UniProtKB/Swiss-Prot annotation:
It holds the Pfam family Proton_antipo_M. The gene is nuoN. This is NADH-quinone oxidoreductase subunit N. The chain crosses the membrane at residues 8-28, 35-55, 75-95, 105-125, 127-147, 159-179, 203-223, 235-255, 271-291, 297-317, 326-346, 374-394, 408-427, 455-475. It comes from the Bacteria. NDH-1 shuttles electrons from NADH, via FMN and iron-sulfur (Fe-S) centers, to quinones in the respiratory chain. The immediate electron acceptor for the enzyme in this species is believed to be ubiquinone. Couples the redox reaction to proton translocation (for every two electrons transferred, four hydrogen ions are translocated across the cytoplasmic membrane), and thus conserves the redox energy in a proton gradient. GO terms for molecular function: NADH dehydrogenase (ubiquinone) activity; NADH:ubiquinone reductase (non-electrogenic) activity; quinone binding. One of its GO terms (biological process) is ATP synthesis coupled electron transport. It comes from Cronobacter sakazakii (strain ATCC BAA-894).
Length: 485
């Protein structure tokens, strides 16, 4: 097989991040220098982001039977790279106080980013599985990075064992699908399913097992039990990656699979997904009500957000509107989550034991860190879906696509879930403006706005507000990024 220049250009983000992994690995072997390795990682991720412009010029193509590079792949690759970049910038000040090996953190983030890019381009069940494993394996190490803390170690063990079990379900499901359809490619699978094969018991069993495996990775109810514990135990920068890059990449590839292989045409699959969405929306929001730990609260909140996205997945028959909904919602979710977890990371830096994740740590923050409090307030309002924020645009799209597809019971769940969510998001926002305690147990550095992490948080807040008022640039970008069949 000869590789053309066009194909190499199409694979640029993957090649650049892969090269960065090798360079950082050699740099660590040569000399341990935290600043140098952090800089190399950030430069590599930025170069991969910039290379997307050249990929766009090359046009859509099937690079290998496993990978398709098109506008859709570029959008999700961009979102994964942005999340990875933010994770590295939040990690740098956090690692300053960390006494064990610092440099491997960036290596693991880069390898996980490789998995995310592979998922964004996946066009085959083999590349889907490889991508999921490539993003999951480094996360085992990242979640347990603060291994001297009991919670971090416990979270890593839970995540490793449950993730391995979920992967086995996913792989067994793929085997059953292959046994029935004779293909692993999304497109060929779609042709097989179009021939009235969706009623075959073996195929439905395979799809059911795949939904279990993917449901775990997306932390949908009832496969969500690991989520709050892992979000709480993992270091704040790692929780950022878990909540954003990991979820976005996996949901992106599931959306492509459902688009090419019309799995949603099966009434049984639609009912199962509908129940998962309904349970995730209501359970995620209800459990978040009682949380006093911000990372646990955001963990339960992410369960409900994936439930909202599942509504758009079930409504995929409505075509372009559904694709647009997922793109806009995930962009809003990315920037809102980066801002919220970014504030927690800044408050927890440098590392000195457990993160500043107690709600009490943020009480009265406005009186000594007003801009940081304003940023956190904007992020909470966006996650709640309040008008004039990007979160509202995403929520509006979900409701519109639900109504358009006559999914009334799920649309009702979205409305009720959003109303419940409003309470706990506002509870976090209000606590920022109460009287500050006499003695502060945790606080962000006074120069936080001049750090790379501070800049990322401020840009996220700005994007959430600007795109909330004027979302057209984002909508146009998402419309350009439709998969070319």
């Amino acid at each position: 097989m000869t590789i053309t220049t066009q194909q190499l250009i199409a694979l640029l983000p993957l090649l650049i991040v892969g090269l960065t992994v090798v360079v950082v690995m050699l740099s660590i072997a040569w000399r341990r220098n935290h600043f140098l390795n952090a800089t190399l990682s950030v430069v590599g991720l930025n170069a991969a982001l910039l290379s997307l412009w050249f990929v766009g010029q090359a046009g859509a193509m099937d690079v290998t039977p496993l990978m398709r590079v098109d506008g859709y792949a570029m959008l999700y690759t961009g979102l994964v790279l942005l999340a990875s970049l933010a994770t590295c910038t939040f990690a740098y000040p956090w690692l300053q106080g960390y006494n064990d090996n610092k440099e491997e953190f960036y290596l693991l983030v880069l390898i996980a980013a490789l998995g995310g890019i592979l998922l964004a381009n996946a066009n085959h069940l083999a590349s889907l599985f490889l991508g999921i494993e490539l993003i999951s394996l480094p996360l085992f190490g990242l979640v347990g990075y603060a291994f001297r803390q009991k919670r971090s170690l416990e979270a890593a063990i839970k995540y490793t064992i449950l993730s391995a079990a979920a992967s086995s379900f996913l792989l067994f499901g793929m085997a059953l699908v292959y046994a029935q359809s004779g293909s692993l490619s999304f497109v060929t699978l779609g042709k097989s399913l179009a021939d009235n094969m969706l009623s075959e018991p073996l195929l439905l069993a395979g799809l059911g097992l795949m939904i279990v495996g993917l449901g775990f990775k997306l932390s949908l109810v009832p496969f969500h039990l690991w989520t709050p514990d892992v979000y709480q135990g993992a270091p704040a920068p790692v929780s950022t990656f878990l909540a954003t890059a990991s979820k976005i990449a996996i949901f992106g590839v599931v959306m492509r699979l459902f688009l090419y292989a019309p799995v949603g045409d099966s009434e049984a699959v639609r009912v199962v997904l509908g129940v998962l969405a309904f349970a995730s929306i209501l359970f995620g929001n209800l459990m978040a009500l009682t949380q006093t730990n911000i990372k646990r609260l955001l963990g339960y909140s992410s369960i409900s957000h994936l439930g909202y996205l599942l509504v758009a997945l079930i409504a995929l028959k409505s075509g372009d509107m559904s694709m647009e909904t997922v793109g806009v919602y995930l962009a809003g979710y990315l920037f809102s989550s980066l801002g919220a977890f970014g504030v927690v990371s800044l408050m927890s830096s440098p590392y000195r034991g457990p993160d500043a994740d107690s709600l009490y740590s943020y009480r009265g923050l406005f009186w000594h860190r007003p801009i940081l409090s304003a940023v956190m307030t904007v992020m909470m309002l966006s996650l709640a879906g309040i008008p004039m924020t990007l979160g509202f645009i995403g929520k509006f799209y979900v409701l519109a696509v639900g109504v358009q597809s006559n999914l009334w019971w799920l649309t009702g769940a979205v409305v009720v879930g959003s109303a419940i969510g409003l309470y706990y998001y506002l509870r976090v926002a209000v606590s920022l403006y109460l009287n500050a305690p006499q003695q502060l147990n945790r606080d962000a550095p006074s120069n936080w706005a001049y750090s790379a992490g501070g800049v990322v948080v401020l840009i996220s807040a700005l994007l959430v507000l600007v795109l909330g008022v004027w979302p057209q640039p984002l909508i146009t970008l998402v419309q350009l990024a439709k998969p070319l069949m």
